[in-house]
């Protein structure tokens, strides 16, 4: 006998906003302290347990199978900075990393700077915010959140003595940048609404209560962050939010000086900055460059009136990031939904792309700690290829594999296939689909298929590898990603065409992808498991009502479905 699901009783609540009355029959479920709410949640949990009970042996088998693929004693690829190689590593059975370094050689004795596992003893929760060594390598600034509130307390460790300095700075956020003298650093602080809005300057050994407020953001729409420039010369202070940014810089050799504005904020103008020699290189959407272009200006006169095009706007080529080196500028782009890495030699303007061979993949640059190098580090992965970390020589074009993500067990990437398809949307637009499957899976419409979708905030979904996914690929499932509008896979217009009054494109695109996969015999109607989270949960709630017959099951993680109440909360 099948268990019956609990039904939440209706208790009408009238809400008024701008003269419009709305009736919400489930408003009462917001009250976490109401015993009736607790009872209802317990009933839902009991129902879930009852429905899933026959699958408990399979759940346990899947858990053990997935866990067995993880190499617990793993470490990051060391990064060179000055005389040290910095990295973090995990030990078998440990939940947190240890931050380590070696002096001058990778085979030198290991120095454990900070073992987070030791700090976590006796605590139910711990999360690291920043972990950044000083330029002279003597101090380590690190911050901890001990209760999940994302408010971090900042600590300073003297690496020569192993002792903590007396200062403990509360309510900080993720940003911290050291001055070049290793005696001063800048950090951000949260307000009561959890918005980072203030930047302070602190000198080691002084009372944090006397720290100097160097910037406060008064516009409640904007957040404040800090970054070290690629060259290491500057501290960047940037305000961001609501399709608007504003950047300032300060010389790290003169921490007592004021931050200098680069370009004043204005609505719908987004830009970010890197530096090289006497010039800034700026990624900007000014003058209608929706997919962004690259301009340059002298550091002495950086305002937009002085900007000169360095890479012109090319519709369909989304410029996503810049990274400067002593002799090169690296430009991250997305073209036709796939990431590209472009390397420009600044002396002569020659440009080359890093070559990738698979039909669908993901790749990204990892910013290093050194400016005066010809080595670019990037990560490559695909739906069938675990993450690979490469060092790419920007002069010769050669590359060295520094790390292959370990996948334990009997994993063999040649057992799997990855494809890139295009579905035709309801309005005739092509919708990209990335998918993977085991080579023995029949492509005759009999296979079950997992279809993931998101489509919001301009967030593009990468076609990357997952150890967990192997467990259902090995059982005959196909896994597919619907790159629907609302993301930015095909450029900024892809995002614009999936929001506000065009939000229905997101829903229609997902349905078009599902129908295409059925038509091409990858699966059949009623054999699709739809999945997504947060804004992707809103997508699933909508398509479940539009075309329920397409789906056998829907898994909506933390679904953003009570949109109006949430936004007005």
PLM features: residue spans?
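Beta-propeller folds
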Residues: 1-375, 379-387, 391-396, 412, ...
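Serine-hydrolase catalytic core recognition
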Residues: 7, 76-79, 83, 263, ...
């Amino acid at each position: 006998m099948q268990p019956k699901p609990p039904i939440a009783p209706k208790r009408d609540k009238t809400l008024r906003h701008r003269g419009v009355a709305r009736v919400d029959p489930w408003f009462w479920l917001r009250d976490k302290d109401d015993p009736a709410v607790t009872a209802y949640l317990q009933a839902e949990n009991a129902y879930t347990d009852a429905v899933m009970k026959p699958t408990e042996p399979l759940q346990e088998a899947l858990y053990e199978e997935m866990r067995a693929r993880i190499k617990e004693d793993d470490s990051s690829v060391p990064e060179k900075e000055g005389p040290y190689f910095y990295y973090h590593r995990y030990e078998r059975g440990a939940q947190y990393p240890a931050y380590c370094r070696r002096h001058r050689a990778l085979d030198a004795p290991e120095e454990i700077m900070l073992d987070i596992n030791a700090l976590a003893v006796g605590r139910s929760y711990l999360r690291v915010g920043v972990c950044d060594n000083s330029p002279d390598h003597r101090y380590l600034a690190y911050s901890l959140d001990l209760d999940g509130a994302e408010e971090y307390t900042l600590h300073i460790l003297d690496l020569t003595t192993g002792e903590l300095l007396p200062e403990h700075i509360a309510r900080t956020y993720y940003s911290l940048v050291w001055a070049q003298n290793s005696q001063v650093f800048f950090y951000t602080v949260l307000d009561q609404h959890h918005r980072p809005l203030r930047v302070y300057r602190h000198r080691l050994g002084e009372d944090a209560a006397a720290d100097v407020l160097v910037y406060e953001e008064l516009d409640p729409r904007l957040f404040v962050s800090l970054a070290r420039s690629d060259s290491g010369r500057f501290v960047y202070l940037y305000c961001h939010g609501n399709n608007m940014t504003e950047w300032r810089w300060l010389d790290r050799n003169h921490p007592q000086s004021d931050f200098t504005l680069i370009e004043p904020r204005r609505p719908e103008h987004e830009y970010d900055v890197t530096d090289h020699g006497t010039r800034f290189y700026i990624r900007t959407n000014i003058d209608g460059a929706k997919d962004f272009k690259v301009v340059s200006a002298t550091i002495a006169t950086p305002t937009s009136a002085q900007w000169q095009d360095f890479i012109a706007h090319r519709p369909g080529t989304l410029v996503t990031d810049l990274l400067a080196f002593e002799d090169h500028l690296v430009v991250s782009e997305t073209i036709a939904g796939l990431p590209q890495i472009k390397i420009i030699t600044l002396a002569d303007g020659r440009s080359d792309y890093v070559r990738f061979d698979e039909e669908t993949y993901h790749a990204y640059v990892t910013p290093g700690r050194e400016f005066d190098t010809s080595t670019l580090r990037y990560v490559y992965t695909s739906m069938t290829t675990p993450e690979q970390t490469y060092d790419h020589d920007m002069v010769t074009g050669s590359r060295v594999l520094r790390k292959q993500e370990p996948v334990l067990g009997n994993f063999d990437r040649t057992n799997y296939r990855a494809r890139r398809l295009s579905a035709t949307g309801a309005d005739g637009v092509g919708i990209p689909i990335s998918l993977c499957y085991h080579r023995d899976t029949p492509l005759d419409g009999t296979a079950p298929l997992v279809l993931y979708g998101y489509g919001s905030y301009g967030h593009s979904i990468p076609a990357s590898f997952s150890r967990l996914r192997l467990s259902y690929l090995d059982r005959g499932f196909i896994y597919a990603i619907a790159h629907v509008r609302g993301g930015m896979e095909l450029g900024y217009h892809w995002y614009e065409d999936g929001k506000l009054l065009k939000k229905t494109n997101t829903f229609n695109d997902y349905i078009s992808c599902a129908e295409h996969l059925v038509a091409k015999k990858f699966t059949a109607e009623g054999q699709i498991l739809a999945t997504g989270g947060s804004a992707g949960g809103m997508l699933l709630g909508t398509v479940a009502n539009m075309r329920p017959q397409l789906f056998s099951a829907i898994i909506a993680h933390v679904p953003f479905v009570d949109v109006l109440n949430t936004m007005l909360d």
